[in-house]
């Protein structure tokens, strides 16, 4: 993978990721397509309407259903999903912990039971890479030991040592496979303990294609999260992309960009959309509320998304109240457009050396009202 750092503005960065299936401008927000699709959207929505170049799918879910060998036999995840941009796949470790009963953490991996049928499985560093090779992921994440917060210092230390060990094992295994189109990212752990974060970086070998800051948005405060990012990001190689996993709000994303983060994913835009919360530059609105029943204006004036160019708030209000499936599609298209435009505009501001003023103006308006 080739990563070109094009510009910086203080610590904020703009770059280009050259992947096997697409060139991706950073900062980038990756819509979450856990099961190989973004909920309520298809590949045409993702590629042609949203213009997404990189989306996230999940190893745990694709492994359990339909099975990575099924996907491989059908031509890999891109052909299977008919999405010809790029895929990043998470290792599935988080889902193994969070969705399964009787999870057992071992030195060689994670033993878990399927949330679908109760069958028993073992994820090892090599196993999760083999699954991702079968999917033909453009970016693969290593298996890591994620800790919920707050956590005792001893547990954090165990987590970072195990995560670093698994990451380094994954790197050696990946080198043996000689698959340059499948890029491998390491994950830095350590909770909000800054010394543990430094130790995690120090224990993780160089040579990965990118580095992720994991283990955040799992119970810590916003200030703790930002302090952790501010400490960790400068420790990572400058010539590699930096990925903040599972975070988050528009404010979180702009704060993290200002601290040197390049890549983001979160279910928030689509999950909020399905639950009637829509993003606008003046804050969030709840489309289920009564005032929108007769509102003939778009979700946001001057928004170029598919929904705003065609439909009114009144129509979206009606679809939500009627529990029509079309509502989820239109609302998700709007919210994802908002997120993708946010990082696009942030990138342009970095290129033009005006990121801090862009961020300030955006947040002043965004936080002015939510209704």
From Swiss-Prot:
EC numbers for this chain: 2.4.2.29
Enzyme class name: transferase
Xref: HAMAP family: Q_tRNA_Tgt (MF_00168)
Family: Belongs to the queuine tRNA-ribosyltransferase family.
Binding site for substrate: 90-94, 144, 189, 215
Effect of residue 84 to Q: In strain: P1
Organism of origin: Helicobacter pylori (strain ATCC 700392 / 26695) (Campylobacter pylori)
Annotated phenotype, changing residue 76 to V: In strain: P1
Pathway it works in: tRNA modification; tRNA-queuosine biosynthesis
UniProt name for this protein: Queuine tRNA-ribosyltransferase
Effect annotated for changing residue 48 to G: In strain: P1
Cofactor: Zn(2+)
Region (RNA binding): 246-252, 270-274
């Amino acid at each position: 993978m080739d990563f070109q750092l094009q510009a910086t503005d203080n610590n904020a960065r703009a770059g280009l990721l050259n992947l096997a299936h697409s060139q991706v401008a950073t900062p980038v927000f990756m819509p979450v397509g856990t099961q190989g699709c973004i909920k309520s959207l298809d590949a045409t929505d993702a590629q042609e309407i949203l213009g997404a170049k990189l989306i996230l799918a999940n190893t745990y879910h694709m492994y359990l259903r339909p099975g990575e060998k099924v996907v491989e036999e059908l031509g890999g995840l891109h052909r299977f999903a008919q999405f010809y941009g790029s895929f990043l796949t998470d290792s599935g470790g988080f889902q193994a912990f969070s969705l399964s009963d009787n999870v057992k953490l071992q030195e060689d991996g994670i033993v878990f039971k399927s949330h679908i049928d109760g069958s028993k499985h073992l994820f090892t560093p090599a196993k999760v890479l083999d699954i991702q090779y079968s999917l033909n992921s453009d970016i693969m994440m290593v298996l890591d030991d994620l800790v919920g917060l707050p956590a005792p210092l001893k547990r954090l230390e165990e987590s970072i040592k195990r995560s670093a060990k698994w990451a380094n094992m994954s790197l050696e295994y990946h080198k043996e496979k000689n698959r340059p189109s499948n890029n491998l990212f390491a994950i830095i752990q350590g909770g909000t303990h800054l010394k543990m974060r430094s130790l995690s970086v120090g224990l993780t070998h160089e040579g990965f294609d990118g580095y992720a800051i994991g283990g955040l948005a799992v119970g810590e405060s916003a200030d703790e999260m930002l302090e952790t990012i501010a400490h960790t990001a400068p420790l990572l190689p400058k010539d590699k992309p930096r990925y903040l996993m599972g975070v988050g709000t528009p404010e979180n994303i702009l704060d993290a960009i200002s601290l040197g983060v390049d890549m983001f994913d979160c279910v928030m835009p689509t999950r909020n959309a399905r639950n009637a919360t829509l993003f606008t530059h003046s804050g969030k609105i709840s489309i289920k509320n009564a005032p929108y029943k007769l509102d003939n204006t778009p979700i946001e004036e001057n928004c170029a998304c598919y929904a705003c160019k065609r439909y009114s708030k009144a129509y979206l209000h009606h679809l939500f109240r009627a529990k029509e499936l079309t509502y989820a599609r239109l609302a998700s298209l709007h919210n994802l457009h908002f997120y993708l435009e946010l990082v696009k505009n942030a990138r342009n501001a970095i290129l033009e050396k005006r990121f801090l003023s862009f961020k300030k103006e955006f947040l002043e308006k965004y936080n002015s009202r939510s209704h």
